Amino acid sequence: MRNAKQPIFLGIFILTLLFGRSTLSAQTVRVEGVVRDSAGAVVPGASIELRSGSYEVETTSDAQGQFVFASVAGLSGLVTAQAQGFGSLQQEWTAGADSRVQLTLVLTPASSHEEVTVSATRTETRLTDTPGSTVALSNTEIAATPALRVDDVLRQVPGFSLFRRSDSRVANASNQGVSLRGLGGSAASRALVLEDGLPIVDAFGGWVYWDRVPRESLQDVEVFRGGASNLYGSDALGGVIQFITRQPGAPAFHLETSYGNEKTPDLSFWTGTRAGKWDVSLASEMFRTDGYILVPTWQRGAVDTPANSKDASVELTVGRKLGDKGRIFGRGNFYTEFRHNGTVIQTNDTRMGEGSLGLDQQFGSGDSLTLRGYGQVQGYDQRFSSVAADRNSESLTDLQYVPEQVVGGAGQWTHLFGKHQTLVAGADIMEVMGASDEQFFSSGTHTRNGASGGRQRIVGLFGEDLIRINSWTVILGARVDDWNNFNASSLCTPVAGTCPSPSVVFPSRSDLAFSPRLSVLRSLNHNFSITGSVYRAFRAPTLNELYRSFRVASVVTTNNPFLNAERLTGAEAGVNFSGLDRKLDLRGTFFWSDIVNPIENVTIDPTANPVLRQKQNLGRIRSRGLELDGVVHVSREVQISAGYAFTDATVVNYTVPPGEVSLLGNYVAQVPRNVFTWEARYWNPSRVMLSVQGRFVGNQFDDDQNQYPLGQFYTMDFQIGRNLTRNLEIFAAAENLLDERYYVANTPTATGSLFNIGPPLLYRIGLRINWPAERQ
């Protein structure tokens, strides 16, 4: 009898196991928790991914740093948390008897070894694995900078400069082209500027409207120095600057407003949220200043008035998730500005509207696709005048209107081969149509009308192979660009005089550019790595250089419809060091660049009134030098950083046209040989937030013949602030604390030189609102 019962009990036991296993497999658990930083503050907007076997799900922490996975099909697994400015965290979890899991995820600040950049390779790459010279600025570092305008923030990066030392507060838009590594002696940019992968360099003129991207919308700014045409084509001759904006998650609102001397109010904000599969963000910025008089006291006359400006921008982005690993979005941007350029008559204004669409889609674990399309319409007005020698009178010489239309698109595919290789391939196209419609005047009389312009189309195909094996990183990339100029003409209609030259229709032109790049990084140990790169890059002449003339003071610079593309051959080598438990980071890079056919403003007749210059292909210039960057994290609150750039940019080959002056051996205009920057920061929001910066800029020349020098100068900036609550901060800031009045322009006149001076001491007081509170 006893033996007969054994099979019955055994069967019941097996059924119990099977039933219990089935019940457990159908059971779901609740996983919840909070994300905090090492100081205990909550971290909103963190990305949390949960895995349990084949089950995967992700979410974002809310304004209180909390997250919930309500129905997880599993009893144990792994959670991965990531947030901007922090290192990644992985934590295992196991459900208790009540089928609930409570987690506290503590993120630590990211070191330079964990920072990620996208500009150098067009795909996410750790900064320490990126060959080349890259500087990354977080939104905390931007807020800690006393400068009000974004271009002034970037001046702390050695090698960065704008044409004529000018800034976006008071400078004419056409003077705001950006240069890296001393490659530009004219106003056209030699570096590509992007916002979330889309170009914001003016396609017609090559300058940059720095204020069209609201400052509070910025999450990071990346500066990649060195030729990057292998990925980005024309404009990336000297590197890439990319603005990366905030991405909406939990409801958030960030605002900065201030008021300063020269009657300067400023307001910038960003707000965004996510609801289900939809996300939306809105950003805007408004600025106005009465400005200051550009001409020094001893040269001023009755016509000299303050150079003032006002601008406004608004940007709306709406996105929607596509499945678990995709997103489509649309963005609209409107920007307007108006400027007085130092006299009553001389003004300019711009109105710009842009729309873009984008798709980001990941396929499986190794493939992703990115698509972008955009269009822009812009109108630019400019008034020029002739100023009398005593500067007590002026007369209108030119009314200029520049209409511009731009369309473009790009596609990129990225494929991962295991853990050690990444392939990138893509294509992009941009077409711009623009003209310069002008009314010319002489002694108050309307003498003639002119219309010059055309169309330009650039199509590029690129590919890149990133290989990471042990301590080696090798990147090989190449790109082919085909650029075409067509429908170009220069027309003249006499009104009360004659035309200086007949109307002409220019033949269509096309050219090809091949831009390869090879970069290598070798990690010697945990502290040292060495890098090296060789590359070619190019820049096609803009429609502005080809077809538009302009006047500054007593200098007229004419266009040149026969310009060729600039071609650069470059090499660089560098050393990176990280020590003292990653509290000390040092980088040094030597670079060498040789440019054939650089486009410069060449003086044709220095004795004429006005002085005559023309945009010409100069022959060949060479820019070589050294970049040094370093930062010491003394403690969590204290940081000291410094940077230095030495740039020797000279003309090494020049065929002298009959009757002109040889430029052989001259320094390239607008390029300082020495730039040194430093910053010391104590950042403890509950006590005080203090930042002090200094910048030294060495001697340079304003002209191609090296006859009009601009002397060296040193400025200091200062900011102090404190949190009133976790979400509200008060601050005061001062730029040019020493009130150094340095020269930014030295232009020839019939009687000698006319100088323009930089800004005086500028100060402001303001408030910042961050909801939810950001990590400082």
Where are these regions (language model features)?
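Short, acidic, small-residue-rich periplasmic hinge/interaction motif at the N-terminus
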Residues: 36, 47, 51, 82-86, ...
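Extracytoplasmic beta-strand/coil segments of soluble accessory domains associated
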Residues: 134, 151-202, 219
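Short acidic/polar hinge/loop motifs at secondary-structure boundaries
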Residues: 198-225, 306
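Periplasmic-side early beta-strands and strand-to-turn transitions of outer-membrane beta-barrels
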Residues: 229-230, 242, 249-258, 270-351
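C-terminal beta-signal and adjacent terminal beta-strands/loops
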Residues: 292, 538, 594-596, 601, ...
